[in-house]
Structure formats: C-alpha cells, structure tokens
C-alpha cells in the first residue's frame, strides 16, 4: 500500500509468507501510524467545521462535545426554519385564496355593471369605487368585509 492511497487497512495476511518478523512488525507499525494520522486529520477537520473551535487547540473530547452541541443547535435551527417555511406556505395559500375570491368578486362586479371591459373597469368595484391591491378592494359593506380583518389578524399572529 503506497503512502498516497486512501486509508485502507491491509491485513498482515495479504503480504507474502516469506517476510521476517521485523518486516511484519514494521509493516504493521506503518499501517497503525497511517490509521492514527487519518483519525488525527479527521479530528482536525471536525474541529475546523465547528464555528466555536475553528483554529483553536482542543482535546478530542472537547471537539466531540462542541461538535455535538453544534449539531443539536443546527437541528433546532433547521426545525425553526422548517416551521417558518410551513407558516409562510399557509399564509401564501390564504393569500392565494383571497386573490381568487377578489378576482371572482371583480368578475361578478363587471358582469353586474354591464359595461364593456376596459382597463379602467379592472380597477373598480361594483359600486364604482377604486379597488386597491392593498385594501382588498372593498368599499362596500359586503359579507366578506368582516372576515378579511380577522384573517389578517390571524396572519400576524402566526408570523410572530
């Protein structure tokens, strides 16, 4: 096995039978040294992967402890981010539902006015009031008005 090979521990049985005891011992020592060097390099790599240990001297026990803490921290952080993603998906679905309801209300308002569709009619409600993309376009006391502020409050509560 050459020095450039990846860490592969060869057994002494793979070597020719005619080696002397000293040769076998030297070969075994070289394999053991290579194994220890690989473990040492792996600990250094792990140490450098943990932000609180980067570039510092630390014992193997400290490296393992800090790596465990960091992994647990990252798991909690990932869980929190996943919850945020799920909340945003729910909010997005609610907003898409509101958009569909507003588009439906707009199309029914256009049918009620019996005016040909023009760019100006796209932005007015059934009573001729201006529809804003931010206020939901409701200038009337329709049934959807009480529901809209409740859903907005709910969205704010979920986000916090």
UniProtKB/Swiss-Prot annotation:
Keyword Phosphoprotein recorded: yes
Disulfide bonds: none
Region of interest (Leucine-zipper), residue spans: 81-102
Major localisation: nucleus
Ranges of compositional bias, category Polar residues: 107-124
InterPro entries documented for this protein: bHLH_dom (IPR011598), HLH_DNA-bd_sf (IPR036638)
Keywords, in A-Z order: Acetylation, Activator, Cell projection, DNA-binding, Nucleus, Phosphoprotein, Repressor, Transcription, Transcription regulation
Residue span(s) of domain bHLH: 23-74
UniProt-recorded Gene Ontology molecular function terms: DNA binding; DNA-binding transcription factor binding; DNA-binding transcription repressor activity, RNA polymerase II-specific; E-box binding; identical protein binding; protein dimerization activity; RNA polymerase II cis-regulatory region sequence-specific DNA binding
Annotated region described as Disordered, given as residue ranges: 1-40, 104-160
Upregulation: By serum; in 3T3 fibroblasts.
Pfam family membership, one: HLH
SUPFAM superfamilies reported for this sequence: HLH, helix-loop-helix DNA-binding domain
Residue numbers bearing the N6-acetyllysine modification: 66, 153-154
Similarity remark: Belongs to the MAX family.
PANTHER family, sorted: PROTEIN MAX (PTHR10328:SF3), PROTEIN MAX MYC-ASSOCIATED FACTOR X (PTHR10328)
Function statement: Transcription regulator. Forms a sequence-specific DNA-binding protein complex with MYC or MAD which recognizes the core sequence 5'-CAC[GA]TG-3'. The MYC:MAX complex is a transcriptional activator, whereas the MAD:MAX complex is a repressor. CpG methylation of the recognition site greatly inhibits DNA binding, suggesting that DNA methylation may regulate the MYC:MAX complex in vivo. May repress transcription via the recruitment of a chromatin remodeling complex containing H3 'Lys-9' histone methyltransferase activity. Represses MYC transcriptional activity from E-box elements.
Assembly and oligomerization: Efficient DNA binding requires dimerization with another bHLH protein. Binds DNA as a heterodimer with MYC or MAD. Part of the E2F6.com-1 complex in G0 phase composed of E2F6, MGA, MAX, TFDP1, CBX3, BAT8, EUHMTASE1, RING1, RNF2, MBLR, L3MBTL2 and YAF2. Component of some MLL1/MLL complex, at least composed of the core components KMT2A/MLL1, ASH2L, HCFC1/HCF1, WDR5 and RBBP5, as well as the facultative components BACC1, CHD8, E2F6, HSP70, INO80C, KANSL1, LAS1L, MAX, MCRS1, MGA, MYST1/MOF, PELP1, PHF20, PRP31, RING2, RUVB1/TIP49A, RUVB2/TIP49B, SENP3, TAF1, TAF4, TAF6, TAF7, TAF9 and TEX10.
This protein's name: Protein max
Source taxonomy: Eukaryota, Metazoa, Chordata, Craniata, Vertebrata
Encoding gene (name): Max
């Amino acid at each position: 096995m050459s020095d450039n090979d990846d860490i592969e521990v060869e057994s002494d049985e793979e070597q020719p039978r005619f080696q002397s005891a000293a040769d076998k011992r030297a070969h075994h020592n070289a394999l053991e040294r290579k194994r220890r060097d690989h473990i040492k390099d792996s600990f250094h790599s792990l140490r450098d992967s943990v932000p609180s240990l980067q570039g510092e001297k630390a014992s193997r026990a400290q490296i393992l402890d800090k790596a465990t803490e960091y992994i647990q921290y990252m798991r909690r952080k990932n869980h929190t981010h996943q919850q945020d993603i799920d909340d945003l998906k729910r909010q997005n679905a609610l907003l898409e539902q509101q958009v569909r309801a507003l588009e439906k209300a707009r199309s029914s308002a256009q049918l009620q006015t019996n005016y040909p569709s023009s760019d100006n009619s796209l932005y007015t409600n059934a009573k001729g009031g201006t529809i804003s993309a931010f206020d939901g376009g409701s200038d009337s006391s329709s049934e959807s008005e009480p529901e809209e502020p409740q859903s907005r409050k709910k969205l704010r509560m979920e986000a916090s």
